[in-house]
Each structure stands twice: as C-alpha cells, then as structure tokens.
Swiss-Prot record:
Originating organism: Escherichia coli (strain 55989 / EAEC)
Disulphide bridges, residue numbers: none
Coiled-coil segments on the chain, per record: none
Recorded name of the encoding gene: eutC
The UniProt record lists the keyword Aminoacyl-tRNA synthetase: no
Keyword set, alphabetical order: Bacterial microcompartment, Cobalamin, Cobalt, Lyase
Record PANTHER family: ETHANOLAMINE AMMONIA-LYASE LIGHT CHAIN, ETHANOLAMINE AMMONIA-LYASE SMALL SUBUNIT
Protein name: Ethanolamine ammonia-lyase small subunit
Swiss-Prot/TrEMBL catalytic activity: ethanolamine = acetaldehyde + NH4(+)
GO cellular component: ethanolamine ammonia-lyase complex; ethanolamine degradation polyhedral organelle
Length: 295
C-alpha cells in the first residue's frame, strides 16, 4: 500500500465520519519540523530536547550544508562526530539518556486512574507484576480466570470487530496516542455499519492474548492496540495487530496483519485509525487476515 492509497483511505473514512482529513503537510514526519542544527556542546542542554537531537558534532566539516541537510532529514544518530576512536561527550550522554528513557517506559505501569478516566473496563493476563511479565511471556498470552468472567459478563457478545488496548512493552505508547486513535477508530467502525464490541484494557498482555479474547467473545475480527518495544529515544510507538476469527489452538503469527510505528513521528494515530477501519472491512469481506488476505 503506497502513500497515495493511504491518503485516499484517510479521506474516505474521515469524510464518512463528517470530518476533514488532515492535509499531507500536517502528517509529515517530525523530522521535518525539528529544531535548527546546533554545533556547540553545552552542559546545560536538555538531552531529550529537539535542540539536542539536532546537534551536529562533526568539527570543521568540509561541507557544513550537507551535514545540516542530512541532520534534518532523519532522527537517526548521524553527524555526531568522534573524539579519536570514541564518541564525543554529548553524543554519548544523549545515547545514555535515550537508553534510560526506553528502559523507563518498559518498567512503568499504566496508572489505574488513567484507565478509569478513559471509562475502560480493565482486565489482566495471568501475570501479576511487571517483573513476571518480562520473564514469562507465555503467561501474558492468557487471561486470568477473573478476566474471562468479566468479559463474558460485561462485553458485547459476537461483535463484528472487537477492539482491545494493552500496555505491552510501552506504557507511553498507550497513554500518549489513546485520544488520537481510539475515538476515530470506534467512530469509523460504527460509521461503516459494523457491530463493534466493548473496548477494554488488558494489563500485562502479549499479542497472542487476542486469540483467547476473540474465542471468548465470538468476535469475527479482533484488533489489538499494543505498545511496541521502545527504541532509543522513541518510547511512544504503538502497533496494531488484527486477526480474523482467531482461535487459541490454530491461529499462528502469519494469520495476523500488523500496522506498526504508530506515533506522531511515524504513522500519525488519526491516519492509522482510518487505515485500520479499511483493513477491518476488507477482512470481513474476504473472511481472512495475514498472509491469507488478497492484496
């Protein structure tokens, strides 16, 4: 699917919802709006700021304009310079700061108050704490007994599409992108005339947990929005895993369709919501997902 197709899907879905699709310029990668490149080192510089990310560490460059253009074109760690065989101090400090940020978002918990404020039902997997979640991924693929009963009692049965939110490996991905992806996603699915299940939050969930959820609720399509494993300095990336008629015993990873890198510096959440709506409609039409879908 190329960019023109994505933009057409966004326009179509947003139009059916009575909203105006954002102009392509509004959905540009964050790198195009980064701060002006900085060449001097400073102990007072915030290592997580746009100014620090735009820093150029190459001393006395032959073509400074080329470095400036390269620096503005990507968020990758380029133009950092060297001090002999070693990285420069500021480049090393920023690397360590980004690494710390990524570790923090893996270890943080989604606050219970935040879940309640969104009006979401909260259930959990068989995991009881973050340490167990990181060391026993198999237990994160199954709901606890209380969660199974809660879903049967409080969720819509046999929906066309069931939307599930889970913390995964990034708390920030959920809390930062939630407001921009779930409301337009739910509105788009309903506008398409689909029976939509009760959205809920799964704490300590892994991707395969959507198979059990789909089986319990009898959902035709299950959409899981889950926090991605964070990269260096990028802790807000969300993934969507969609699967048709999942079953615990027979569904394999090739049966899932994944849309990744959903955040303001990647695929904007509102745009992703429109693409997911179109994906769900095609899954229901073809009665397939993953590699079984007709491209």
């Amino acid at each position: 699917m190329d960019q023109k197709q994505i933009e057409e899907i966004v326009r179509s879905v947003m139009a059916s919802m009575g909203q105006t699709a954002p102009a392509p310029s509004e959905a540009k990668c964050a790198t195009t709006n980064c701060a002006a490149p900085v060449t001097s080192e400073s102990c007072a510089l915030d290592l997580g700021s746009a100014e620090a990310k735009a820093w150029i560490g190459v001393e006395n460059p032959h073509r400074a304009d080329v470095l400036t253009e390269l620096r503005r074109s990507t968020v990758a760690r380029v133009c950092t310079g060297r001090a002999g065989p070693r990285p420069r101090t500021q480049a090393l400090l920023r690397f360590l700061a980004d690494h710390s940020r990524s570790k923090d978002t893996v270890l943080k918990e989604v606050p219970e108050e935040w879940v309640k404020a969104q009006g979401l039902l909260e259930v959990r997997s068989e995991i009881s704490d973050k340490n167990l979640y990181l060391t026993r991924p198999d237990m994160g693929r199954r709901l606890c007994a209380e969660a199974v009963e809660a879903l049967k009692a409080q969720c819509v049965a046999n929906p066309d599409v069931q939307v599930v939110i889970s913390d995964g490996l990034s708390t920030d991905a959920i809390t930062v992108n939630y407001e921009e992806i779930l409301p337009p996603l739910m509105a788009g699915l309903k506008q398409a005339g689909l029976k939509v299940g009760t959205p809920f939050f799964v704490r300590y969930g892994r991707v395969k947990i959507e198979d059990q959820i789909g089986e319990i609720l009898g959902a035709k399509v299950v959409i899981l929005l889950v926090g991605e494993r964070p990269g260096l300095g990028q802790s807000e990336s969300l993934s969507c895993y969609a699967v048709y008629s999942p079953r615990m015993a027979t569904t394999v990873e090739a049966d899932r369709t994944c849309i990744s890198n959903i955040h303001q510096g990647g695929t904007p959440p509102v745009e992703a919501a429109a693409v997911i709506v179109d994906l769900a409609k095609r899954m229901l039409e073809q009665k397939a997902s993953g590699i079984n879908m007709t491209r």
